[in-house]
Amino acid sequence: MNIIRKLKPGTISLVLGPMFAGKTTFLIHCIYMLERLEKKVVFIKSTKNTRDKTIKTHSGIQLRPKQCKIIESTQLSDVGSLTDIHAVVIDEAHFFDDLIKCRTWADEEKIIILAGLNASFEQKMFPSIVRIFPYCSWVKYIGRTCMKCNRHNACFNVRKNADKTLILAGGSELYVTCCNNCLKKYIY
């Protein structure tokens, strides 16, 4: 299936999944396709994302965009004018409390692509994802295999330490993604 047909001006697309599932890799693929179509793309990442100052996945895949502008921000409302931009790509969308700002950009006929976690380490939806969900014309779920048993589909993010902070950026040093069976062993 050619994803580019789903990415139309004025629409919001949402990619959800657990950690380490390939959501950022999917965004990189979308950026490459949009750049091949000579679209001006802006990639927005949260300042809470401590991975790198570039577009980089947990597995180390890095995008070297031709013309894609990278913006780091704590809030989408601080991004400023995007008048000359065709597409807005947002990684770790759950980090942004004002994700609903994407509706304004969609009303301006921009292609909006969001990627975020399906749930927190407490297995609860992020409020900003819940608020933007009804406005998404296309939703994709990317799964992965359980990091504990390597047998079942994993959809749960589990924090390895006792920190209860809702947003705590990190990788495999802080989190594991597991299936329902392994989640029961972790929590109970």
UniProtKB/Swiss-Prot annotation:
Q: Which PROSITE patterns match?
A: TK_CELLULAR_TYPE (PS00603)
For the ligand (ATP), the binding residues are: 17-24
- Work out whether the entry's keyword set contains ATP-binding: yes
What's the protein here called? Thymidine kinase
InterPro entries from the UniProt entry: P-loop_NTPase, Thymidine_kinase, Thymidine_kinase_CS
Q: Which UniProt keywords apply?
A: ATP-binding, DNA synthesis, Kinase, Metal-binding, Nucleotide-binding, Transferase, Virulence, Zinc
Q: Which reaction does it catalyse?
A: thymidine + ATP = dTMP + ADP + H(+)
